[in-house]
């Protein structure tokens, strides 16, 4: 069986886009397991400007018409249909070209799995609600109906998918995560500070940044040694700058986009990682920090709440609330101050990633998902 991951972009792990990171990791692990896997990317830039990788990659030009399918991609799909058993794995949702791809796959009798990566969670659907409602009825409903399985990364997505169409065949399965190697930072931060961190795209509607800044400000006014490191960039950078003014002067540091060892070196110096998203598929940044032994504060909307509770590696907020965040930070700060032997949450954090997000344990479930798609 051949597995084709089809995405917008190039599956470049050195981008802030979480879908790129997930697809890169999944394809890498499948290749290492001896599976016949490739990534096909639709992009306006056909340059191979990404790090060396183990799996095959083909890039196809994006068309000016968002529904347009490049002739080269149409031909590649025809060749795939005649080359034996194959499953196409689509990543993302509300992508016009996927409607065209789905129609072509149906005509070629090629099964496909769709992973929306958080796009069908209730909070995500509320953004541009009217436009999405119209688009869903005209185009997205076809994509969903024809999917052999809709692969959900978290429970919030299952709820969203069932609200769109309760008859759809869903599969709930997280992706795995390969823990990064700890990095000694080039310029270690001064000791004695309680460092809270965030890493991701600066998009308030998605990431709940107003809550993050307000909750931290409330906390920091009572804990003068607190700092907030914000790693990333995005459309709400100016708003984050403004919201940071509510915190004590100098306590919020906007570090911009960081990648590779530089990012890992920063994450490893944190005492808490905070992720107050309104919706997610499964946020890679949280797993990166937790794998380094950093406790976390997450909202239920991250789809990580059950894991954090089960492994005891942080705090879970029912919703993105500044008051709830401040209270959670106070509890974690109290543990940090106590420094009682055996009280560190770091072992629990590492155990969560090594157990619940272990690729060798999850890959058979992905294979079963593809076999079900072939049999559908």
Where would I find each of the regions flagged by the language model?
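Conserved donor-binding/catalytic core segment of Leloir-type glycosyltransferases
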Residues: 4, 188-207, 213-217, 229
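Carbohydrate-associated surface elements
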Residues: 156, 176
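N-terminal strand-loop element at the rim of the active site
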Residues: 7-16, 22-68, 160, 236, ...
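Membrane-proximal helix-turn-helix segments that form the acceptor-binding/catalytic region
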Residues: 107, 132-150
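Nucleotide-activated donor-binding/catalytic signature segment of Leloir-type glycosyltransferases, i.e.
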Residues: 240-258
């Amino acid at each position: 069986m051949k597995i084709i991951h089809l995405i917008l972009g190039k599956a470049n792990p050195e981008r802030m886009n979480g879908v790129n990171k997930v697809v890169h990791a999944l394809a890498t692990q499948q290749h290492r397991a001896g599976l016949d896997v490739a990534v096909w990317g639709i992009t306006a830039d056909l340059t191979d400007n990404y790090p060396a990788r183990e799996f095959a990659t083909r890039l196809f030009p994006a068309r000016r018409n968002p529904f347009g399918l490049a002739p080269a991609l149409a031909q590649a799909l025809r060749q795939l249909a005649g080359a034996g058993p194959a499953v196409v794995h689509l990543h993302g949702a509300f992508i016009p070209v996927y409607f065209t791809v789905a129609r072509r796959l149906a005509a070629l009798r090629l099964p496909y799995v769709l992973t929306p990566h958080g796009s069908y969670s209730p909070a995500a659907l509320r953004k541009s609600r009217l436009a999405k409602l119209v688009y869903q009825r005209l185009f997205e409903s076809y994509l969903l109906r024809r999917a052999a399985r809709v692969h959900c990364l978290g429970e919030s997505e299952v709820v969203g998918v069932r609200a769109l169409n309760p008859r759809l065949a869903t599969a709930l399965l997280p992706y795995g995560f390969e823990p990064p190697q700890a990095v000694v930072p080039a310029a270690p931060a001064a000791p004695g500070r309680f460092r809270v961190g965030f890493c991701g795209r600066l998009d308030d509607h998605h990431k709940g940044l107003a809550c993050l800044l307000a909750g931290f400000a409330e906390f920091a006014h009572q804990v003068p040694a607190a700092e907030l490191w914000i790693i990333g960039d995005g459309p709400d950078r100016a708003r984050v700058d403004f919201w940071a003014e509510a915190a004590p002067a100098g306590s919020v540091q906007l570090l911009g986009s960081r990648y590779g060892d530089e990012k890992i070196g920063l994450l490893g110096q944190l005492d808490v990682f905070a992720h107050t998203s309104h919706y997610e598929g499964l946020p890679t940044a949280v797993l990166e920090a937790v794998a380094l032994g950093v406790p976390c504060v997450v909202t239920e909307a991250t789809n990580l709440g059950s894991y954090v509770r089960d492994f005891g590696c942080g705090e879970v907020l029912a919703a993105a609330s500044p008051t709830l965040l401040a209270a959670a930070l106070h509890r974690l700060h109290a543990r940090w101050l106590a420094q009682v032997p055996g009280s560190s949450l770091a072992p629990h954090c590492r155990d969560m990633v090594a157990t619940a997000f272990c690729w060798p344990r999850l890959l058979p479930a992905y294979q079963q998902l593809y076999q079900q798609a072939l049999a559908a």
